[in-house]
Swiss-Prot record:
It comes from Exiguobacterium sibiricum (strain DSM 17290 / CCUG 55495 / CIP 109462 / JCM 13490 / 255-15). Xanthine binds at L20, N27, K156. GO terms for molecular function: xanthine phosphoribosyltransferase activity. Signal peptide: none annotated. NCBIfam families: PRK09219.1, XPRTase. InterPro entries: PRibTrfase_dom, PRTase-like, Pur/Pyrimidine_PRTase, Xanthine_PRibTrfase. Keywords: Cytoplasm, Glycosyltransferase, Purine salvage, Transferase. The lineage of its organism: Bacteria, Bacillati, Bacillota, Bacilli, Bacillales. Disulfide bonds: none annotated. The keyword Glycosyltransferase applies. This is Xanthine phosphoribosyltransferase. Homodimer. It comes from the Bacteria. Its main location: cytoplasm.
Amino acid sequence: MKRLEEMIKQEGLVLSDQVLKVDSFLNHQVDPTLMWEIAYEFMDRFKDAGITRILTIEAGGIAPAMMTALRLGVPMVYARKTKSLTLNEGTISAEVYSFTKQQTSTITVAEQYLQAGERVLIIDDFLANGEAAFGLAKLVEQAGAEVAGFGIVIEKSFQPGRQKLLDAGFRVESLARIKKLEAGEATFVDPVTV
């Protein structure tokens, strides 16, 4: 997605050869116009997939997931990384390791918000090693639902997440695919025209 790549080039900060900071428009401060465009792109790519629900993980995936749910006209639920007092019965959970935070979390969703038979589109802000993606897929499978695909805003293609998901038989649609982070710059896999 050309506009997303331009935002990454203009406002993204390459902190290392592994870390890209995009908190000025995606995962701290949010650019709603860009999120609306991202949602349109995901809607276009998954319009024939029979999506009945969007699932994401707090917090960076919430904005693009919410806008995509709005575009597709389906509900959105996010997996919580910390269990609150109100989320104490009827839950499904999975362990997820965060590359950015360098810690393992137990992600949780109330069973009532992820039902058997649903076709779930998983949306997330980043794909690196695939840990969060597989954790979310485990939640969907535990619920007896089906993963219809993954919509990734920014994919670090130099890390193994995409290939792991493809090898597991999942559909992966990424809007910006980063080939490398080097010398303060992000280089993309393929120039896009969308």
